């Protein structure tokens, strides 16, 4: 065989192939595996086994006595960072006779711009729209020159104009004229939007209080998510939610919550039958509702702090628009059931309707009377004026007789006028005090629902007694007429306050009774 010559590259290739020979992988099993079958499934379902030990025994931390007895040092400055000299009070006293520095006086001077007289200076702020600036990016200041109107001046002028445009009702006459203006404005035809001149009305409908439904107190319930049932959708879900009920419940631990009940299939059929027949309910039928959700609640009503009035509108075809009041606002949030606490998922609400009893009917009538407020105020004012004038005439006769019989019948008119002025001041003060007491009592009645009207009656009696004293002290016929005018004013103001407070007390007590009673349904 002829000799061959190998190059250095061939020698390296042969050496590299011999050095990187693959080693066969060994199996992890000593013996040879014959079968490769997988394990069978567990013949029964997995189960939860109760853990008999306390779950917190490995993680619960208890402080030792050394940690409890140790006192941590609070390293702070002795003056807490506030350097105040409490010993010498003259340290921070300012001398009123001190002279300011010349540089500081410049800061206190007002900037007064002298009127520019030269024609050249007047051309500086002139805007020439057809001229192009050489810089593409420029501010408003650079584009339109120096502006003499400062933003501070603009803000001050706008605030002043706002105050002049707004009607600030400071006195009684301006308030009365503003109230009367609202009635006149309501009679005017609406031709355009109040803030958008191009928007015109499509249809104009009158708005009235809902006398039909005002007797029933309404509440606004706000859910944090859609309470619709999961197994229903569309019109079926809306029909079920329209017949839903909420009731307060309590779990085994004594925690209160709100349960949301939905009607069953049998109840839905009964409610549809009642609607077709035009009935509110069937007296002998029983309606079943099953619990669907559990909520925590937050309630706000008229007695709550920060309460805001809320109304809703009802559009009735061919009749108009009616508004009603939402006295209560309820916010519902989903309730988290604690571990180990049995929830009321199987709770069933059984409802059987009945007729309303006397207290509920009285509460409805009180709400209707509160809305109508049909007190004949003018007739009452006339009757009160007549009574006061008759009593004042009798008192004037008694006073004139006493003056004829008495030895001091020739007193000066100035003294009687002075006494009359003092008595008028006393009457005004007592009227103010009685009005403040009435207002405080009315607020208290709205919150606590009391039915006491003795304060207003006492104020009326005080007004009549004071008027009697005026009649006895006055001597001349003119003073008697003045006393009659004062007495008629005080007497005409106080009885209406008592009647109004009495009416509000009846309304409040009736509303409290209505809220405490059920809405015409017994739930088991």
Curated annotation (Swiss-Prot):
<dbReference type="GO" id="GO:0016593">
    <property type="term" value="C:Cdc73/Paf1 complex"/>
</dbReference>
<feature type="region of interest" description="Disordered">
    <location>
        <begin position="1"/>
        <end position="23"/>
    </location>
</feature>
<dbReference type="GO" id="GO:0003682">
    <property type="term" value="F:chromatin binding"/>
</dbReference>
<dbReference type="GO" id="GO:0000122">
    <property type="term" value="P:negative regulation of transcription by RNA polymerase II"/>
</dbReference>
<feature type="compositionally biased region" description="Acidic residues">
    <location>
        <begin position="468"/>
        <end position="481"/>
    </location>
</feature>
<feature type="compositionally biased region" description="Basic and acidic residues">
    <location>
        <begin position="359"/>
        <end position="374"/>
    </location>
</feature>
<feature type="compositionally biased region" description="Acidic residues">
    <location>
        <begin position="375"/>
        <end position="384"/>
    </location>
</feature>
<dbReference type="GO" id="GO:0006368">
    <property type="term" value="P:transcription elongation by RNA polymerase II"/>
</dbReference>
<feature type="compositionally biased region" description="Low complexity">
    <location>
        <begin position="490"/>
        <end position="500"/>
    </location>
</feature>
<dbReference type="InterPro" id="IPR007133">
    <property type="entry name" value="RNA_pol_II-assoc_Paf1"/>
</dbReference>
<dbReference type="GO" id="GO:0000993">
    <property type="term" value="F:RNA polymerase II complex binding"/>
</dbReference>
<dbReference type="Pfam" id="PF03985">
    <property type="entry name" value="Paf1"/>
</dbReference>
<feature type="compositionally biased region" description="Low complexity">
    <location>
        <begin position="510"/>
        <end position="524"/>
    </location>
</feature>
<feature type="compositionally biased region" description="Acidic residues">
    <location>
        <begin position="420"/>
        <end position="436"/>
    </location>
</feature>
<keyword id="KW-0804">Transcription</keyword>
<feature type="region of interest" description="Disordered">
    <location>
        <begin position="359"/>
        <end position="524"/>
    </location>
</feature>
<feature type="compositionally biased region" description="Acidic residues">
    <location>
        <begin position="448"/>
        <end position="461"/>
    </location>
</feature>
<keyword id="KW-0539">Nucleus</keyword>
<feature type="compositionally biased region" description="Basic and acidic residues">
    <location>
        <begin position="396"/>
        <end position="407"/>
    </location>
</feature>
<protein>
    <recommendedName>
        <fullName>RNA polymerase II-associated factor 1 homolog</fullName>
    </recommendedName>
</protein>
<feature type="compositionally biased region" description="Basic and acidic residues">
    <location>
        <begin position="437"/>
        <end position="447"/>
    </location>
</feature>
<feature type="coiled-coil region">
    <location>
        <begin position="412"/>
        <end position="442"/>
    </location>
</feature>
<comment type="subunit">
    <text>Component of the PAF1 complex, which at least consists of cdc73, paf1, leo1, ctr9 and rtf1. The PAF1 complex interacts with PHF5A.</text>
</comment>
<feature type="coiled-coil region">
    <location>
        <begin position="351"/>
        <end position="384"/>
    </location>
</feature>
<comment type="similarity">
    <text>Belongs to the PAF1 family.</text>
</comment>
<keyword id="KW-0805">Transcription regulation</keyword>
<keyword id="KW-0175">Coiled coil</keyword>
<comment type="function">
    <text>Component of the PAF1 complex (PAF1C) which has multiple functions during transcription by RNA polymerase II. PAF1C associates with RNA polymerase II, is involved in transcriptional elongation and in histone modifications including methylation on histone H3 'Lys-4' (H3K4me3).</text>
</comment>
